[in-house]
Amino acid sequence: MVSPRKGKRIRMLKKNDIIQVAISDLSHEGAGVAKHDGFVFFVDNALPEEVIDMRVLKVNKNSGFGKVEAYHYLSPARNADVNLTYLRTGIADLGHLTYEDQLTFKKKQVQDSLYKIAGISDVTVESTIGMTEPLAYRNKAQVPVRRVNGQLETGFFRKHSHDLIPISDYYIQDKEIDRLINFTRDLLRRFDIKPYDETEQTGLLRNIVVRRGHYSGEMMVVLVTTRPKVFRVDQVIEKIVEAFPAVVSIIQNINDENTNAIFGKDFKTLYGKDTITDSMLGNNYAISAQSFYQVNTVMAEKLYQTAIAFSDLSKDDIVIDAYSGIGTIGLSFAKTVKAVYGVEVIEAAVRDAQQNAALNGITNAYFVADTAEHAMATWAKDGIKPSVILVDPPRKGLTESFIQASVAMGPQKITYVSCNPATMARDIKRYQELGYKLAKVQPVDLFPQTHHVECVVLLIKE
């Protein structure tokens, strides 16, 4: 191989080679980026400005992956206090970066996506709204259970593997959730409950899922098992409730499939209620084991407040809430508008949204189980003319058919809540081609210590 640079011959790199590199940037997933002889390498736990010895792990045609063998220079933006376990599992893959710099990184992710994908550079991306206390914020935990060194353990999988790393302090989870997981782990050891073996397809307990209401403090425990019968389940329940009076719901889920999915289809309430209750922006919500409910309540409120402010609503406005889930965004809007029409493909979520509307005495919010495209076409025939269409899609973003259907409704504004800057930028580009202009962009940090960023954008009809 001959380099275009003055014909210099370059030795082809291979696995386990060790080279010295300088880190120039962070990838969108928070990995350090190093360039060496025409190759781009991605390195975990490496920050811009750092100089490292890197072991080559994998080499592709023009890129590769490496790991740090030694540091020659450390970035002043490095958080030296983070436990490397959190980086190895991906629990906190940006935990080695100071929080102020995490917020800057997330703003840059949004800016870069808008410029590279949508060609937009003339709209101000505001500074990321951060969290005052950016640790111990998650109100939900999904923890795998496996046998490690001969005993039942809870923790997280090493990145890109199914090797469990035992963990007691999960860093970004509510500390009371951590306590409950650790107590349940120790209790199940005493009762000799067999952990799931993924390779042999044996054992009983696959996962422990815990939810906690941020404001209510109510807690739910879900034991995911491979079969219905659980040995000494009454004694397990008694001990958990005795130690944690805030536990108001204990549920068993049966998952006997060879799958990476957390839950199977069958749920059975073993103790207490089917749901816990919590509040957001003054509304109460019944939250089931399966409900999609933002894991960071404090920052979700700021996210929704931003969406409401961008939409600039009045009592004469009609809002369509696409991807309405259990109604958290739509019901937050309902107080300030004439009506909210929500659509969601998951029927159980629609039932939850309807129940949550009733729970809060909200009578101007209507939820249907349907595709958004079909529901909007039906509403248009019924003469419903929205001022604002609110979208909060999954990471894959919007489909072309959805974009076309939403534009056909003719809203003056589209408020887009995104969890993926790349697909958001792609969708904004398409909306601009169809007559909408990007007006406002606000990143919000729902997931401190990780590379993930949420964003609210406002599109206005030209």
Curated annotation (Swiss-Prot):
S-adenosyl-L-methionine binds at residues 294, 323, 344, 392. GO terms for molecular function: rRNA (uridine-C5-)-methyltransferase activity. CDD domains: AdoMet_MTases. Keywords: Methyltransferase, S-adenosyl-L-methionine, Transferase. The active site is at residue 419. Its EC number is 2.1.1.-. Residues 12-70 form the TRAM domain. PANTHER family: RNA M5U METHYLTRANSFERASE (PTHR11061), TRNA (URACIL(54)-C(5))-METHYLTRANSFERASE (PTHR11061:SF30). Belongs to the class I-like SAM-binding methyltransferase superfamily. RNA M5U methyltransferase family. This is Uncharacterized RNA methyltransferase spyM18_1360.
